[in-house]
Amino acid sequence: MNTPFLIIADDLSGAADCAVGFALAGLDSTVLLGCDVSPGLQATVLTVDTDSRRDAAEVAAGKARAALDRHGAGRAVIKKIDSTLRGGWVAEVAALQPALGMALVAAAFPELGRVMRDGLLYVHGQRLADTATWQLEHAGREDRPAVQLRQAGLRCEVLPSTLLDGDAAAVQQAVARAITLAWTQGCQALVFDVEQTHHLRQLARATHALTGIFWVGSGGLSRELAAALPAAGARAAASVPTAGPDIAPAWSSTGTAESPGHTVLTVAGSLSPMTRQQIACMATDTRTRVHTIAAAELRQAPGADLSLIHI
């Protein structure tokens, strides 16, 4: 039986990113836009967008706890956070910890150039506190995750990335010992140094079956947790159609304007510069049609239900 998950995210793009990772691993995933929305069908992976990225810390914490209270029964929990530590994630973790146990924190996302070394987050080699974004939004504020958690009242330690090096069995034992020791010493949160994607993968594989813990991390950790679930690879492979020797797959690029084959609908709702670049790149293909739709038009559409997305 698949482990049911609750993912609590503070914005929609992060919520969708995590949900898609589990969907690609073969698990049915639903995204709820708000804590009070009913999921309808009971999905294996339930992701709640609390829309709290810009809320005050106490408001964000209240939304996270409300999501847990309403949807968390019987589910392993991931608190999705931004890989550059935006939002009220510290208050959210502090609100969730008493109910869930040890927080395993891995904010790094090496594929995007965000790594954790000696308890410090680096963005493309630059310490987070020195980046233009941090200077603009958080100048003078603490950027070390462990220190932030301690300031919120949680007892926290940092574990080195070397703990995640080695063969999987040895890493699993080492991580389990570290968590047990930290817990017996009264620790409530562990921040993991992560410098490479394989560190995230090792952490996910070593902890996916543990109880009395919850994960705090970016989309990178969520993706590795999805892949670490038993038979996830087999489920994902089984869900991808294969072509016979004389049959082109549905997504074949051999289609023409006269015989286009399947049409792909891409919906982009992010304001990030990277998303804009991706849209511009797609628009250079003569087969692509780009339509810009104002959010107000979607909200006013007759019969529109914007509270639930099933993936």
Residue ranges and their predicted role:
Residues 2-5, 29-32, 44, 55-77, ...:
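Cap/lid and interdomain-hinge subdomains that line or gate substrate/regulatory clefts
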Residues 3-41:
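N-terminal basic/disordered segments at the start of proteins
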Residues 11-13, 52-53, 271-272:
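Short polar catalytic/cofactor-binding loops
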Residues 14-17, 88-89, 200, 275-276:
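Short glycine/serine/threonine-rich phosphate/pyrophosphate-binding segments
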Residues 45-51:
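A structural-propensity feature for long, helix-poor, extended segments
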Residues 122-305:
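Conserved, well-structured core segments that form the ligand-binding/active-site neighborhood
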Residues 309-311:
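Conserved small/polar residues in nucleotide/adenosyl-binding loops
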